């Protein structure tokens, strides 16, 4: 198994950016892979490009427009607004069916072609917003499936799986990239960089985590 190279599934948001710099500390060579699925806010791809260019990280953008055709929701359609709060039942309307399944599957194909075993993704079960494809059981099962499907030893790593948003901010702080994550990323479901709109579930979770981080760790 190649212990010197890794691929990061990279959206340009808080979690994947934190994972990107975590990977840079751990591996000699890191490749960031982003996906263009004709998402509503293309600014996230621009953020991903800018971060990789600025910090000299190899970046690959894969075309996955088919996902947009199959999964209409508030992140892929201009006429569907993002719910301001999580529904009492079911998944939020920002959930893109199959997204992490397809992202990780295509990244695995790319990784095998490059002789890379480690795949890093920023999913978290602690703050998973009701998304079923952010759960540890899904990641573990997909890891086994990909290994069997391609007769290859992939290792899907999830540095944020069991930590909350405050602890994710703390990780960025410990890595020395707090300002990068705070100012250069896009987490907002309404496509606003840095602190975002302040109203969507992603912004609320990000802000709540930062305030908890400040209170707990920046005394």
From Swiss-Prot:
It catalyses: 7-carboxy-7-deazaguanine + NH4(+) + ATP = 7-cyano-7-deazaguanine + ADP + phosphate + H2O + H(+). InterPro entries: QueC, Rossmann-like_a/b/a_fold. Its EC number is 6.3.4.20. Disulfide bonds: none annotated. The keyword Ligase applies. Keywords: ATP-binding, Ligase, Metal-binding, Nucleotide-binding, Queuosine biosynthesis, Zinc. GO terms for biological process: queuosine biosynthetic process. GO terms for molecular function: ATP binding; ligase activity, forming carbon-nitrogen bonds; zinc ion binding. The keyword ATP-binding applies. Zn(2+) binds at residues 188, 197, 200, 203. ATP binds at residues 10-20. Binds 1 zinc ion per subunit. Pathway: Purine metabolism; 7-cyano-7-deazaguanine biosynthesis. Gene3D superfamilies: HUPs. Its cofactor is Zn(2+). NCBIfam families: 7-cyano-7-deazaguanine synthase QueC. Homodimer. Catalyzes the ATP-dependent conversion of 7-carboxy-7-deazaguanine (CDG) to 7-cyano-7-deazaguanine (preQ(0)). Belongs to the QueC family. This is 7-cyano-7-deazaguanine synthase.
């Amino acid at each position: 198994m190649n212990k010197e190279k890794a691929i990061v599934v990279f959206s340009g948001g808080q979690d994947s950016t934190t994972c990107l710099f975590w990977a840079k500390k751990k591996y000699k060579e890191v490749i960031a892979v982003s996906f263009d699925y004709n998402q509503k806010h293309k600014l996230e791809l621009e953020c991903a490009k800018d971060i990789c260019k600025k910090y000299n990280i190899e970046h690959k953008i894969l075309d996955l427009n088919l996902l947009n055709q199959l999964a209409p929701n508030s992140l892929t359609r201009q006429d569907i607004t993002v719910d301001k709060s999580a529904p009492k039942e079911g998944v939020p309307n920002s959930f893109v069916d199959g997204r992490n399944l397809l992202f990780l599957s295509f990244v695995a194909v790319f990784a095998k072609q490059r002789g890379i075993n480690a795949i890093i993704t920023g999913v978290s079960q602690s703050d998973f917003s009701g998304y079923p494809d952010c759960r540890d059981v899904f990641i573990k099962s997909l890891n086994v499936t990909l290994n069997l499907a391609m007769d290859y030893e992939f290792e899907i790593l999830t540095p944020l799986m069991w930590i909350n948003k405050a602890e994710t901010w703390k990780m960025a702080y410990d890595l020395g990239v707090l300002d990068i994550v705070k100012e250069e990323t896009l987490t907002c479901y309404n496509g606003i960089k840095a602190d975002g709109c302040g109203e969507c579930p992603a912004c609320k979770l990000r802000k709540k985590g930062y305030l908890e981080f400040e209170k707990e760790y920046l005394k």
